[in-house]
Amino acid sequence: MFYSIFFIHILRIVLVDCNEYSEENVDDRHKWAVLVAGSNGFENYRHQADVCHAYHVLLSKGVKPEHIITFMYDDIAHNKENPFPGKIFNDYRHKDYYKGVVIDYKGKKVNPKTFLQVLKGDKRAGGKVLKSGKNDDVFIYFTDHGAPGILAFPDDDLHAKPFINTLKYLRQHRRYSKLVIYVEACESGSMFAGLLPTDINIYATTAARPDESSYATFCDDPRISSCLADLYSYDWIVDSEKHQLTQRTLDQQYKEVKFETNLSHVQRYGDKKMGKLYLSEFQGSRKKASTEHDEPPMKPKDSIPSRDIPLHTLHRRIMMANNMNDKTLLMKILGLKLKRRDLIKDTMEVIDQFMFNVKQPNSNATIDETMDCIEVVYKEFQSKCFKIQQAPEITGYLSTLYNYCQKGYSAENINGVIRKVCG
């Protein structure tokens, strides 16, 4: 009898030890992910493609589906411009990543207010929210347009300070143990530079510096007019896909993605000591199946600046048009967009001329003062002049307004000029 009890006890120990190293690692129950494609419209195909691909990678690595929260407008897969109805691809191999993706927030629910509510676990978001606690690790991935101090959503913008304040709230309320953020957007570094504390267990990387464009890739598909991926996003997703994440650190991925994303300068912010941690703590620890990557990932090609994509996509639609009527209509639209681009440029030049007559402040603003100023100024500019969602190319000019705030000009003076120029 004694030997039977002893044998059962030993067997239990062995089974527990085996379970700790099984593919369904119990530790994966303490991982949460929030994936955000912040755009809509077929010319922004790549953002939803990035999120769909990332979703499948996290699932394959062991993150529980109930712990993945997705934001996607969901207007791409069944878009009339999509020659492959019901499918979304992320490179020229045309592997469908849309199938199986559970979208928690779509359409008008893809907005900054709901996003911040989800992060805080606020049930007023109306759907799945982050329920992480002090022992949980969180991964946030965002892809869309950006400008200094903002990330764009379909109808509104997320400003840097409210985002950083939300992250601080999560820390104060012990809503995570460690948190990692990846951001794909033009000027994405401006969301964190000088703003993200280095002592709250948050590690962030961005596709670009605070003052440069990010890049799209796979932009010349023979049948799809839009770009299929973002360069930084595709690089990190494929890097996670092909490696065993229990043996690959955050810094190893950062350095590899920085090397591969050779058209912009990938940046790193926050607690850089976290770079020694393994990716498995945030993206899952399951071993890849032996057949999972028989076909090696594609090398990104045909990359262009994100700001040039609206015109690039329109040029490709003209080339792919099946009849002269469609081609003529698209040519007219192209002409209007080129005129709009010139109008934006002229508008910013006139604003510069008016600002020349405003007395220059004696000292520059602090980073906090700059962010407070630019939030007010951007809202006025988008109300009176142009919205990012209507004219993504304005992101290349908004740095002008940011620079005025940075130099210490008051939001009141800048907005006074904006009203003179744009009415």
Curated annotation (Swiss-Prot):
Keyword NAD found: no
GO CC, any one term: vacuole
Biological role: This protease is used by the parasite for degradation of the host globin.
Manganese in keyword set: no
Expression (tissue specificity): Gut.
GO terms under biological process: proteolysis involved in protein catabolic process; vacuolar protein processing
Signal peptide: 1-18
Prosequence residues removed at maturation: 19-29, 286-423
Similarity-based family: Belongs to the peptidase C13 family.
Name of the protein in its database record: Hemoglobinase
Keywords: Hydrolase, Protease, Signal, Thiol protease
Annotated EC: 3.4.22.34
Disordered, as annotated region: 286-307
Domain of life: Eukaryota
Catalysed reactions, as listed in the record: Hydrolysis of proteins and small molecule substrates at -Asn-|-Xaa- bonds
GO MF, one annotated term: cysteine-type endopeptidase activity
Bias (Basic and acidic residues) ranges: 289-305
Catalytic residues of the enzyme: 145, 186
